[in-house]
Regions:
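Active-site-adjacent alpha-helix immediately C-terminal to a catalytic or transition-state-stabilizing loop
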Residues: 131-194
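Extreme N-terminal starter segment of soluble prokaryotic enzymes
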Residues: 1-5
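Short glycine/proline- and acidic residue-enriched helix-loop micro-motifs
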Residues: 102-124
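Acidic, His/Gly-rich catalytic cores of divalent-metal-dependent hydrolytic chemistry
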Residues: 194-207
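Short aromatic-enriched loop/helix-cap "lid" or pocket-rim segments at secondary-structure transitions
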Residues: 16-19, 85-89, 158-160
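Loop-to-helix element that buttresses phosphate recognition and phosphoryl-transfer chemistry
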Residues: 8-64, 118-130
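Phosphate-coordination/substrate-recognition cap region in phosphate-metabolizing enzymes
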Residues: 37-110, 181
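Short, well-ordered beta-to-alpha junction loops that form the rim of enzyme active sites
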Residues: 54-55, 78, 146-151, 200
Length: 207
């Protein structure tokens, strides 16, 4: 059996101020405190390796956990957050330009042939999640800690449940239902070809 501990990255100023994140957005002061809290939690949880998204906010969270617990760490773009168009990154979500882009993305979320620029649509995100799950299954480690992002982790859970059958309406409903705090811990197990969600959104380490 393989156990995968998923941790969402710590908070950023973008999270706190309603701004679309940049790839290089670092943790805020609050996010660094959250990362330290979850790192202490893993003093009591044996883990073979830390795999983290290479986006700065996740990489910083993963590095904090790995350094405190003397664990090997791998930075993997497979576990990045859903990619938004470059034009909105760094913008507040309530600007006219961002609202118009949000409308465009919503209208074309399920259209595999239409994109504004370099963003991911539903099909891109699903295929990357399926690839990430296959990668985790193939790794030799039995206990893995993955530091990733809220929307991508939701898609991972959907793909664990339904694989290629995940549909846009199904994902959208689950995405709004599965609330995830910054640095919250979720645990999944893989055994005999099947995934099981054991713990979701455990943030007791934050007090």
């Amino acid at each position: 059996m393989k156990t995968v501990y998923f941790v969402r990255h710590g908070s950023t100023e973008g999270n706190e101020e309603g701004v679309y994140q940049q790839v290089h957005t670092p943790l805020s002061a609050l996010g660094r405190r959250q990362a330290a809290c979850v790192a202490r939690r893993f003093e009591r949880i044996p883990v073979d390796i830390v795999i983290t998204s290479d986006m700065a906010r996740a990489a910083e969270t993963g590095r904090c956990i790995a350094e405190r617990n003397r664990l090997p760490i791998v930075f993997d773009p497979l576990f990045q957050e859903i990619l938004r168009p470059a034009i909105v990154r760094g913008q507040r979500r309530d600007t006219p330009e961002a609202l118009e882009m949000r409308r465009f993305l919503a209208e074309n979320w399920t259209n595999a042939r239409v994109k504004h620029s370099n963003e991911e649509n539903f099909f891109d995100l699903k295929q990357r999640a399926l690839k990430a799950l296959a990668h985790l299954v193939a790794r030799r480690e039995k206990t893995v800690l993955v530091v990733t992002h809220g929307t991508f982790l939701c898609m991972l859970i959907c793909c664990m449940m339904a694989g290629e059958e995940v549909s846009p309406p199904w994902f959208d409903r689950l995405h709004h239902f599965l609330v995830l705090k910054n640095t919250a811990l979720s645990v999944c197990e893989y055994d005999q070809g099947k995934w099981q969600l054991v713990i979701w959104n455990d943030h007791t380490h934050l007090g």
